[in-house]
Structures are given as C-alpha cells and as structure tokens.
Amino acid sequence: MPPSFPSLPLPEAVAATAHAALLALAALLLLLRAARALASRCASCLKAPRRRGGPAVVVGDGAGGALAAATAGAWHRAVLASCAYALLSQVAVLSYEVAVAGSRVSARALLLPAVQAVSWAALLALALQARAVGWARFPALVRLWWVVSFALCVVIAYDDSRRLIGQGARAVDYAHMVANFASVPALGFLCLVGVMGSTGLELEFTEDGNGLHEPLLLGRQRREAEEELGCLRVTPYADAGILSLATLSWLSPLLSVGAQRPLELADIPLLAHKDRAKSCYKAMSAHYERQRLEYPGREPSLTWAILKSFWREAAVNGTFAAVNTIVSYVGPYLISYFVDYLSGNIAFPHEGYILASIFFVAKLLETLTARQWYLGVDIMGIHVKSGLTAMVYRKGLRLSNASRQSHTSGEIVNYMAVDVQRVGDYAWYFHDIWMLPLQIILALAILYKNVGIAMVSTLVATVLSIAASVPVAKLQEHYQDKLMASKDERMRKTSECLKNMRILKLQAWEDRYRLQLEEMRNVECRWLRWALYSQAAVTFVFWSSPIFVAVITFGTCILLGGQLTAGGVLSALATFRILQEPLRNFPDLISMMAQTRVSLDRLSHFLQQEELPDDATINVPQSSTDKAVDIKDGAFSWNPYTLTPTLSDIHLSVVRGMRVAVCGVIGSGKSSLLSSILGEIPKLCGHVRISGTAAYVPQTAWIQSGNIEENILFGSQMDRQRYKRVIAACCLKKDLELLQYGDQTVIGDRGINLSGGQKQRVQLARALYQDADIYLLDDPFSAVDAHTGSELFKEYILTALATKTVIYVTHQVEFLPAADLILVLKDGHITQAGKYDDLLQAGTDFNALVSAHKEAIETMDIFEDSDSDTVSSIPNKRLTPSISNIDNLKNKMCENGQPSNTRGIKEKKKKEERKKKRTVQEEERERGKVSSKVYLSYMGEAYKGTLIPLIILAQTMFQVLQIASNWWMAWANPQTEGDAPKTDSVVLLVVYMSLAFGSSLFVFMRSLLVATFGLAAAQKLFIKMLRCVFRAPMSFFDTTPSGRILNRVSVDQSVVDLDIAFRLGGFASTTIQLLGIVAVMSKVTWQVLILIVPMAVACMWMQRYYIASSRELTRILSVQKSPVIHLFSESIAGAATIRGFGQEKRFMKRNLYLLDCFARPLFSSLAAIEWLCLRMELLSTFVFAFCMAILVSFPPGTIEPSMAGLAVTYGLNLNARMSRWILSFCKLENRIISVERIYQYCRLPSEAPLIIENCRPPSSWPQNGNIELIDLKVRYKDDLPLVLHGVSCMFPGGKKIGIVGRTGSGKSTLIQALFRLIEPTGGKIIIDNIDISAIGLHDLRSRLSIIPQDPTLFEGTIRMNLDPLEECTDQEIWEALEKCQLGEVIRSKEEKLDSPVLENGDNWSVGQRQLIALGRALLKQAKILVLDEATASVDTATDNLIQKIIRSEFKDCTVCTIAHRIPTVIDSDLVLVLSDGKIAEFDTPQRLLEDKSSMFIQLVSEYSTRSSCI
C-alpha cells in the first residue's frame, strides 16, 4: 500500500498513484519538447539570414508536407466524448462529496476523483491537440494512459463488488462506486483506442505531403525502375526492433492506411533484399547446381537444395515451435494443483496467486511464440515458392524441343501454380515431424502424474489412433493424386480453348468443346467428392481419437486400482485436448509428405529435362572470320531418335553482309534451317559456327501483351531517332496514327487485336531495333499486302539491313532476285544453291517454283490485255454477271450514297480527337466490403440453402455433447483422493463414451453435410462461369489475357472446390464453440461477463479494422497472380524468339519482379493475420487471467472446485478459440473473394442466342449463297470510331468475290461482321433473303465455312481436328485429305488418322496446318466459304494448288477471298476494294483493270512489277 494514502483501499491508492505519475511524466515530456523547440529556433535564428515578415509556420506531423486539412470522423468525436464523459463523472463525484459532506469532507474522499479529474482534463486537451497538430496516431503515452485507466477501473469495480457482497454497504463509497461503474463503457472504448492507436482523423496534405488519399499511380516501367532504385519504401519488418517484432506493430502503418482507404499495390512496402525472389532463386539454384557438379552421376536432390538454402530460418522457427509446445502443456499440468487449492489443500502461502500468475505467463508466452512461429513458416514458404517458381521458369526458357513436346504449356504452368504451391505449403508441416514425439512425451509425463502407470495404455492407444489414421490418409492421398491429374487435364484443355476461342466461334464449335470441358469437370468432381468425403472421415478420426485415448486411459487406471479425481481427470482431459491437434495433424502430415514428395518428384523430373545444348552453335569472334554463318556436314532432327533426319547434308557458308533467300515447297525444312542456325533443333552431326549477334522473326508472330513501343524496344533503351527510323522502315507510321494511343496502345493477348500484317511488322521492328549482326526472317512478308510488302522489302531488307547479314525464308518469288544466294530446299536437303539467274538456267525444283509464280502473273496480264468482248474466253474464269446486273449493283450502291468507282476518302483523325481507350482492360477488382449478396448467393447455390440449418444443428449438438461429457467426468469423480466417487466406474465410462462418441458422430454428420454442400455449390458455380465465358462476345477475349481467365478457372475455382464450404462451416463451428466456452466460464464466474462484452466489442472492432486491409490485400493478391501465370504461358510460347534475341536474362528478371509483386501482398496479408491473432489472443489471455484472479480471490468453499477446474480447462482454450473465431471469419471473407471473382465472370455480357427457336432458317439455307450488305456500319466499341462506314453491295450466289485493300481498310472487320463476331452498329447483312441478325449464332456460323489466316490445330489427332463434331465417316475424311494433298503424308504415318497433333500443332508445318484447315472446309460443304488470307503462309505452287481445289470443289459456292496476293483474287467474278472502311471500287476484275486510275490496278501493278522494282 502506498505510504502517502494510508486510509485508501489498495486499488484506489494504486489508481491515484498511477494517475499522478502519468501526469508528472506528461508534464516532463512537454517541458523537454518545449525546451528543444526553443533551442532549435534560437540556433536557426543565429544561422539563417533575416527575412522580411514573420516566420513561416507549417502545421504537420513531419511526414514530408504541410497539413492542409484534418477532418474529424465519428471515431475521433467518440474519443473526445469519452474523455469529456470521464472528466464530467469525476467532477460530479467531487461536487457530490462537497455538497453532501460540506466542511466535514475528508481528503480521502476527494483525493482520487481530484487526481482523476486533472488527468482526464489533460487527456482531453491532448486529444483536442491531435486535430491541430495532425496526428494520424495518438502518442504512446496517451494510449498507455487509457489502457491503464481502464485496467484500474475494472480492478476497482471488482474490489467494490467483493467488499459490497462480503462486508455490506458500509464498506464502500457509493458515489465512487457508481461513478466507477458508469465510466466502464467509456474507458473500455478508450482502452480499445489505446490498443489500436488511430486518431480517426482524415488527414489531407499539400502536394509535398504524403498523399494519404491518392494512390501512387505509376506506369509499369517507371514503377519497376523506382523499385530497383529503392524509391519505394522497404518493409519495416527488415529493420524492426525486438518489441516491434514481438508485437508485429511494424505492420500497423500499412493497416492504418488500409483503414482509411482501399489499399493499392503501391501502398505495400517492398520486400527486404533477403526475402526477394532473386535472393531465394540464387540460393536454391546454387545449391542445386552444386549437387549436379559434385555428384555428376546422381540426380540432384531438390529437397536437399531447399534445406541447405533455408536451414537458418527453419532452425529459428523450430526454436519458437519448441518453446510454444512446452508452455502449452503448463496449463494442463497445473490444473490438478489448482483444483486441489480450491478444495482447500493449500500447499504454501499465496499459492493461488502464484498459480494464476504462472497460468498467465505461460499463456502469454504461448501467444507470442505461436505468432512468431507461424509468421516464420509463412515467410519460409514464400521463399521456397519464389525460388522454385523462378527455377521452373528458367527451365521453361531452356527446354529442348523433345522436352518441350513432352510438356504442354498448361502442364508447365501447373508446375508453378500447383506443385510449387504445395511444396511451399509444406513449411507449415515441416516441424511436426519432431514435434509430435515431443508432444507425446510431455503428455505422457503429465498423465503419469495423474493416472500413474496407466499412462502406458495412453501410449498404446495413441499409437493405435495414429495407425488407424494412416489408411485414411493414404486413401485421401490417392484421391488427391487422381484429383490433381484430372485437374491438369481440364486446365490443359481450358487453356487451349481460351487461346483458340476465335476459331471455335467461327466454326460454331464452342458448344462441343464446352461439353468436353464439362465432361472433364465431371470426372474431376468424382474424385473431388471422394477427396471431400475422405476429409470428413479424417474429421471423425480427429474427434474420436482423444475420446478413444481417454476411455482406454481411464479404464486402465480403474482396472489397475487407481483412483480418479476431478483435478486429475480435468488435467488429463486438457492434455488429451492438446494432444488432439498433433493426432489430427498426423494424417495431414503423412498426406502432405506424400503430396509434397509427388510434387518434388514432378518438379525434379521437370528440372532434369534436357535443355538446349550450349554447344549447339559455336560463337566465333567477328575479328577471326568473315563468315557470319558456317554450317558443315550438318544433320538435324526435331526427333533425335528417328531414322530420317529433318535436315541432312547441310553445307552452308554465309559471308558477312550477304542476303540469303531460302525457298521451297511446304514441309521442305525452311524454318528448320533457321532453327539450326539458332541452335533450336537437335544437331545429329556437323558443326554450326555463328559470328555476331542474331535477331529472329518467326513465321507465326509472337507478340507480348503490352504496348507496341514495349514490343519494339524489347528491353532496349529508347533512342528516339533510331526508333523513328525503325517505324518508317517497317511501314508502321500510318498504322500507329490510326491506332488508339499510337505506339502506347496496349495490345491484347498474343496481339489478338492487331491484324496479321501489323503483328508481323511489329516483329520486324523489334528485330531491326536490336541492331543485330545477323537477321533470320521466317517468311515475314506473307501477311502483308503487295504494296506494303514491296515497301517493306525495299526499306527493310535493301535499305535498313543493307550492311547486315540477312537470311530470309520466303514464298514470294519476286523477292528472290535481290538475294546474293538462294537456297532451294526439298525433303530436308539443299537441292540447289546459287544466284537467281543461275538457278533458272539449272531448272528442276527452283524452276517449278518460279513457273508457278509466272503463271499467276500471266493470269493478271491476260486480264490487263483483254477487253469486254473476250471476258468469256479467259481460262478458269467463271461466267461473270451480265453488264445489266453490274449496272444494277452500281445503281444500288449509288442509291445508298456511295459511288461505285470512286477512290477512298482519306479520313485523317487528329490526335486530340482520339478517345484514349486502351484495348486491354485492367482486371476487374471489387473494392470495399464483400457484399452480403455474395454470401447469400453462394449459400443458395446448393440445394437452395436447405443444408445450412442442418449443418448448424449438427454443430450445436456436437458442442452440447462435448460439454456434457466433460462436465460428467468433472462432476462424477471425487474432489480429492479421500472422497468417495459419486457413481460406479462402469457407469462413469459408459456415460462418458456415449456422450463423447455421440458428439463425434454429430461432427461427422456436419462434415459430410459441409462436403456435400460445398461440392454442389462448386459444381454449379463452375458450370455457370464456364457457360458465361464461352458465351461471352469475342471482344471479351480480345481485351482479356488468357492467363487472367485461367486464374479464375484454376486458382479461384480450386478455392471454391476445397476451401469455401469448409471455411463457412468452420466459422459456424468456432462461433458455437466460443459460445460454449463463455457459457461454461460464466456459469462458474459470472463476473467474467464484465470483460467478455467489451472484449467482444474490441474483437469485432479489430476484425473490421483488419479486414479493411486484408480484403484488399487478398484482391491485390488475386490480381497479381494473373501476370505471373500469363508471363509463364507467354514466355513458353515465345521461348524460341526470346532465345533468338538473347533475352533470357531480361525475361528472367521480369519474372523475378512479378514474383516480388505477388509476394509483397502475400507477405503483408499473412503478417496481417498474425497481427490480428496476436491481439485477439492477448485480449483473451487477459480475460482468462481476470477469471483466474476472481477464482483465487474467493474464499475456499464458495465455488465447487471441479466446476472451477472445468472453467479453467475451457478457459485455457479461450484465446485460441477467440482468435480462431475472428480469424475464421476473416479467412472466409478473404476466400469468398474467389466466389466474388467467379460471379464477376457469371455476369459477363453474352452474345446473341445460339438458336432462336421461332426464327430458325430452313435446313437447306443458304441455297444460293447471295450476300447483300445494306448500309453496314461497324465499330468495335461504342466509344470508338466507325471501322466500316455504311458499306452497301451484293455478292451474287455462286460467285467468287475477291476482297482487297490496304492494311487497316476493314477487310477482316467485314468478315467478322458476316460471322457476327462483331454486331453491326447499323445496317444489315442479308443472306438468301434472311437477315442474319434475326437468327441464332449457331444457325448462322454452322452454315458458313472459313479458312482463317492463322491455321489452328488442337491437341489430339488428325481425325479430331478435321471432324471435331464426329459427323463424317473415315472414308469422307480420307477423301478430303486426298483432295487437299495430305493423303500421302497421313498414310505414311503409323497411326494414320489417329496421328498425334501436339499443342498448337507444333509437329506440323504452317503450310500443312493450312491444308488441314482446307480439309475442314471440304468436309463441312457449306454454301458460303470465306478465305481470310488463307494462303499467306504457303508457297506460290501450294497457293495455286489450293486455288485449284477451291475452284473445283466449291464451284457452286459463294467464295469470299481476302488476299494480299493479287493472283489469288484476279480470277474472281467480282472484286471489292475497301479503303478506310468504305467501298472504293466494286466491279469485275476486267472492268477495274480497264480503268487506269482505279485503286485495284495500282495494287495489280505493284504486285506484278515489284520484283523488277526491287
């Protein structure tokens, strides 16, 4: 008792002393601050020159800028009101004492209220100052003051209650007691404020300030550069002090920002250097490679590499885990002593208080160590995942062709998304291997004290429980493996469908492929069902094991003649409850070990795959040779084990500065020759020497998602002058003027919203900008029109690359004369090599190629030389419409406001008139609280929510029976060893078994119901999302990267499959368990309710405070996952290009950056969970300590010892259950975001109906194939300009229509409108008198046929690619193959029609893929056929062959041909010339060629003369 207040009760004396001390400390700090400010001002006055006017006063908190405004919210006003309320209550007490006692008032009565009144006046003043100064958080002294005040208030209230009950009304001062009780709510709120620290002020700073309210908006390059330079702050975790680490307060600034506004990625601090992906990758890769070098004949161990890299982290985590395990058994060990104390068996003075203190310290240590342990394993998991992901990515860039063919891109993505995740998650189970034996030893030691030698039976029962769980775990592992295999298959097919959605829609195949995916999902669901039901069995084993162990232990003790006491039984039950966790974890541990081993084996197998050999090509210094490329005795094969190599007897010497052209028929090995120079194709013999750097342009354009400038620069620094020269050389200037944002326009996934010619020219620009020594160009001019091709060849090959070594593959014969050397390939051999004239004289293969080209040119010459009287004599020329018909068509066009033979009007759009709309949309992300509609919708997905009440009922029954079984054991056993038992031992065990096993059955029922509910909801959501995605318009796929969609159907769907339902059930479970714990504790000590209510309020507030940040972190996490997946799939697809440019390091760096962007919110999210749990458990620990203090303060005999022991037993779990309750809701809120994201895709806009039942066309439609365009207007978006401007014309049925025009003139848009991939803004398209907008999309597209520019093959077989709908016989398929000249090739293969087609058709040449696409059209036999640049990638001879097949097989069909090769359309019945989205000309080729000013004749002239011009 303090000497200055001898007459005061102890709690009031302590309160007065504490308030006085805090007042003195505050005064001292204010004086020191004033003195320091005065000294600083004096020093500045002495140093600084005098200025006019007074000193500038900046009010702020020193955050880097002046405070502009501080707005007080409800929180801050509540703080002020609470302080004022506390002050007024003390003033009221003083007034009452003076009024009642008058002059007889004692100093004792006035001392405490007077000191408290002064204290609250000071606190109110400090709270008011917060707004003036601009505090975001209250000072530490103020917060401590509030917490201490609340604690003292509760202690005084308890002391007053005890004295009132024990000694009567005279023992207390009513005025003080009433004021104290009345202050509890206000002080409880201030205590909460003290814990949280926030002032509740909305601060706004000037632009020099910290900008709390504006997110940091940085472009990708700027943000990356700033992060590399360290401009963004590094996480405070990196250099936090011990106290900050222990309390996790280093995270508070981020959570404070999140409580004020939604977090953005820029708000999240950077990871410390040691935590970044680069550091983790270097460490793991170094240890892995060291094993490879030290033990060359043995496969390196990935497990060992991980352990060697992170053993220090594992050791620190193990220390925390060991301390946590030991202190967690202190409570069960002391329960029996505590029950003995309450029974009156006091061993030493103050035993009760000492026991209560030990309980408190143990729980405190348990809380602190648990949070450090869990955060430590989370961080270790992030390190492992980052390092492994980087290793998988690096391997994906270096795979040889054979290895690449054995792993699809979907499988490689799955290695990263699934296997790496699983290995990283094993960090949670890593320490369980040695902790389980430690926990069993500690448990046996406690049981030996309570039940003696019977603890041996406990060990036997524990071993049996573990043994019983092993088969269930193995079964679960089996189901998990099957589930993962089926998921891999579904994801592979989903990825393929998403990448090729355009062809699926054009061919009306989307329903077929969607049904295939649904069938795959059904297989996956079968294994998912068994996996979930096996999880229910594991749950039953989990709850049954401690009951089984308890029955065996107690039964053995009774049989051996031992006596059970209430304290011993409660101690044993508490021990069994702790032992329950490792027993439950053991099956999970076995399962996770098995799953992790499988994942490690898969990853290790992948990392051991063959890479491209470093010696495939030999780099020779330029100073030592004049040869840029030198191949001698070369033999190469994509399949090293085949008897027939792809290329053989290759001898090639290319002198530096030469232009080498490579030509040949399709499948002759042209692209393979370039691959041999790059080192991409396995070398069987010979050598390849390269001198200088290389740039590679593949035949199939590879474009990254990003803007055009980034694609051209490709990691190089911007040189504006060189950049402009590149743009001009690649004929991109006009395209950039027309594109939105110019070269800053973000292009879609794989450049999907660029035309084929634009993609090819962007590729060429990328290569040219690199300023390489050797240029390898694989048919780069096939996708552009004649004029652009001529310009490209002159500006690019002949001018920009005049001094470079160029090897170009081409099918355009007109580009061959400019070559210094021409290589003619056939069947993998160089059959001829030489200059153009020499090869012409030699004849053979080269002569055949040139002859085919000359025939096409001669066809155009015939048209130019003929007149109207000789039209009918043109070879292969179909009968053209009569002159009157043509005139009618002209008149119809004129009536619609368009002349038939006018030049296109150049419409130059000014930059200031462009609407700044990006073509790739940012990923949709909700902000703020998850809507309750999401929860309700999800719960209503399965059986309309009827299972929810049953789940709650089963959980309630489980909790009631659990409490009843423990209460029965505490009540029926004697208090001490000398007392007689209240019931027979057999009855004791039978009743206990009945209650306990009954509770286990109810929890088993609950698990089954949750699994059934979750499975039904997951399946319904998946089907709904899948159908909405497949029904989405093509514009959605044009503007959404496939990786983003894959993220939803893989990651988010997995969360819904395996997590959401159990999170929902877990929240209901913890809620009911928490209510049970509170009920038991309050039954014994009702006073605990005094703290339970404010504690619950504090917990709810902290949960809301936390979830505001956690929710946004989870959303950011989901968004940041997509770029990682997308870069994986994108890089794997373009690995050859990346390697060809020598850009592996840059892409690896990009991958590491994206991994850090993903790890930043993940680290903060995991730390936020521990931050919340720590505070929840600390509150629970203080409540438990308060309960213990009440129990030991009651006189002996007041409370029944067994019931008090039961309350303590449950109280030991209070902190864990309280934190788990809040945490379960928070995790549910975070996981439900996956449901929210799936619902976003369930609300995607849909295309028009596939079938309109009341408006279906006849089965024979279209009979004639007439196509009439009436004032057709098309734009891609409502806010974008028109692409087609009122096009009106008619394509007569059965005629051949050629559609030509410059790049960007609207040719492909017209075709998209015909197939309704884009719905017209205005006008109509009439086919055989039916408006196509009035019928279903499936009815339309299934009656049309198209051979697209980019031939698409699906993984599977030739049969499946030709006839995916399984509508044709084998005979019909063979006939189609023979017609498209592939019959011999397919018959030569062992599998015939079942010959495999790899992902993207990589094992077939581009020309062969195009012929397969022709085979599809032959089988479909549609009346209308569209060729969209269908022959752009084949040689002239093959082009002529295809045209011959089309003329013979589609002679009665309407054929619309878009082509850049003029001979392809020169023999058409009509030619439509488009310019800037309008009809420039539409007439017969002969008439157009007669008009010397026509645009068509210019195109013809350009094509026929460009070879001579070159």
Swiss-Prot record:
Domain of life, per lineage: Eukaryota
GO BP terms, alphabetized: transmembrane transport
GO cellular component annotations of the record: membrane
Broad EC category: translocase
Protein name: ABC transporter C family MRP4
UniProt keyword list: ATP-binding, Membrane, Nucleotide-binding, Repeat, Translocase, Transmembrane, Transmembrane helix, Transport
Region (Disordered): 889-925
Organism field: Zea mays (Maize)
Gene for this chain: MRP4
Binding-site residues, ATP: 664-671, 1301-1308
Nucleotide-binding recorded as keyword: yes
Transmembrane segments: 12-32, 55-75, 78-98, 109-129, 138-158, 177-197, 319-339, 342-362, 373-393, 427-447, 453-473, 540-560, 945-965, 985-1005, 1060-1082, 1086-1108, 1154-1174, 1179-1199
Family matches, as PANTHER family: ABC TRANSPORTER C FAMILY MEMBER 5, ATP-BINDING CASSETTE SUB-FAMILY C
One MF term in the entry's GO annotations: ATP binding
Pfam families: ABC_membrane (PF00664), ABC_tran (PF00005)
Chief localization: membrane
Family the UniProt entry places it in: Belongs to the ABC transporter superfamily. ABCC family. Conjugate transporter (TC 3.A.1.208) subfamily.
Membrane topology note: Multi-pass membrane protein
Family matches, as InterPro entries: AAA+_ATPase, ABC1_TM_dom, ABC1_TM_sf, ABC_transporter-like_ATP-bd, ABC_transporter-like_CS, ABC_transporter_C-like, ABCC_6TM_D1, ABCC_6TM_D2
